Each structure stands twice: as C-alpha cells, then as structure tokens.
From Swiss-Prot:
Residues 45-64, 70-98, 100-135, 151-169 form the EF-hand domain. The modification Phosphoserine is found at residue 178. Detected in cardiac myocytes. The lineage of its organism: Eukaryota, Metazoa, Chordata, Craniata, Vertebrata. This is Sorcin. Disulfide bonds: none annotated. It is found in: Cytoplasm; Sarcoplasmic reticulum membrane. PROSITE patterns: EF_HAND_1, EF_HAND_2.
Amino acid sequence: MAYPGHPGAGGGYYPGGYGGAPGGPAFPGQTQDPLYGYFAAVAGQDGQIDADELQRCLTQSGIAGGYKPFNLETCRLMVSMLDRDMSGTMGFNEFKELWAVLNGWRQHFISFDSDRSGTVDPQELQKALTTMGFRLSPQTVNSVAKRYSTSGKITFDDYIACCVKLRALTDSFRRRDSGQQGVVNFSYDDFIQCVMTV
C-alpha cells in the first residue's frame, strides 16, 4: 500500500531528512546555509528549538507570506511531527526538513485558494488532500474539514495544522503497518500515545 508523501504515492510534498553539518560551512570557502541564520537567532546553546522558538523563527523568516503568522499550537504540532527522540525540540536538520515541507504546503494552499481569499473551503480541502495522495472517505474528509474550518473556511494556519497532523498520523500508522496492508492493531496505550504525541 502506498502512503501519502512516501515512495509510490501521489503528491510528494514530504521530502526526506537532510545530512551534513548543521548550518555552518563544512569546508573553507563553502557558504553557510541561508536558513541557519533564522534558526540560530532563536536556538539555545543546545542547538535545539522548541515550539515558542519555532514560532518566533517562522514569524521572523516571513515563510507565512501575507498570511497570519502560525499560532503556538500549530508550531507545537510541527515540532512533534519531526520530534523523533521525543525531546519536545528540533535541531537544524529537522528545521530544514520542516522548511521544505512548509514551502510545499504553502504552494499547494495557494494553488487551491482560487479566489485568493486566504482561505480554502471544504471542497477545496478535499481536492488538496486527494492531490497529496490521501485516500480518505467522504465522511473522514467531512470530519477533517469541520475540525479545521471556521464558518466553512480553512485559514492557511489551520491548513498547515491539518497537513502536519495528517502527515504525523500517517507516518505513525505506516510504522505500525509492517505488511503495508492499510490495517493495524493498536493496544489502547499505543493508540493514545500515537494520537497524543501529535
């Protein structure tokens, strides 16, 4: 079974991790990664950022464009999506991965915001999710749309929160679906951990 954002699936807005030295030049004469300046401006001495720092970093970088800056809860979701060691923080390589994903999702949002209102409606969300490779029932899409819309409109921030949660839950499901059959068995505790850490 193909999963959205993974090899064999349509869409492909979820690039993999990045190797190499965080931010700084690896060899004399090599230039510093331009994203490192945004990251280093808010990172502590441990070289990690938490959700508060990520929110400041993304706001200062202007990645949201003309849209409202990301709220703290959306930033918490972003950190948890990439927090593989469950530390509540992300390093520079995870930040670079997030940056690439956010840019892809932003372009995707813009392409579905046909009236340039800064929002998408539930039907546009359904089309967007389908083009990203998510094969969800109409009932599930309706539930997702209700969860992330206000007065029938989904803002950029809520769209990103929705994408982050869908990716994180799909990744968690995929890790447990070793036979790639689209079906897994969860213990209650495992289910709660899976859902609450997203």
